[in-house]
Amino acid sequence: MQIVIDANTILSGLFFPGNERRLLVASLRGDLTLVYAEDVVDEVYAVIERAFHDHPDLEEALARLESVLAAGVLVERRRYLNAIPRWSEQLRDPEDAPVVACADASGADGVVTGDRDILESRGLEGIPRYRTRELLKLLGLARK
């Protein structure tokens, strides 16, 4: 299963224990393949630089990030760039369009996010959207 992941889900998994971290670990085990929009990777690094630059676990988080990126699939912006305007019109927050455009362009099996704008948008029929807990359950990886 190939799933596009958004920046907040990645950041949560890098810096905090919980379902998001379990999802990143599952990707390292090969239980699923995480798909990264180039815009999302850029956003993750920008947020780390801005908000986590003095976090006590920064080095460990950066090493974890490099591992999960290497285990996944990076989708270059040029592959989904033309789809961004169309998806921007379907979303309450146009800033979320690269995530959905990447899912569309890459043929991924869905998107994992905690972003309500993506989860609740009515214009995204055909693109499955999952909260992290739902996806872990679907994969048989949820905590009992």
Feature-to-residue mapping (PLM):
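Short secondary-structure boundary segments
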Residues: 38-39, 114-116
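PIN-domain endoribonuclease scaffold, especially VapC-family toxins
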Residues: 26-33, 38-86
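Short, active-site-adjacent cap segments at secondary-structure transitions
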Residues: 10-11, 42, 118-120
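Active-site neighborhoods of divalent-metal-dependent phosphate/nucleic-acid chemistry enzymes
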Residues: 73-110
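Short, flexible helix/strand-to-coil boundary loops that buttress conserved ligand/catalytic motifs
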Residues: 15, 27, 48, 122-125
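Glycine-rich, phosphate-binding/catalytic loops in enzymes
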Residues: 20-23, 52, 128-130
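Acidic, PIN/NYN-like endoribonuclease modules and their adjacent C-terminal/linker elements
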Residues: 93, 104-109, 116-144
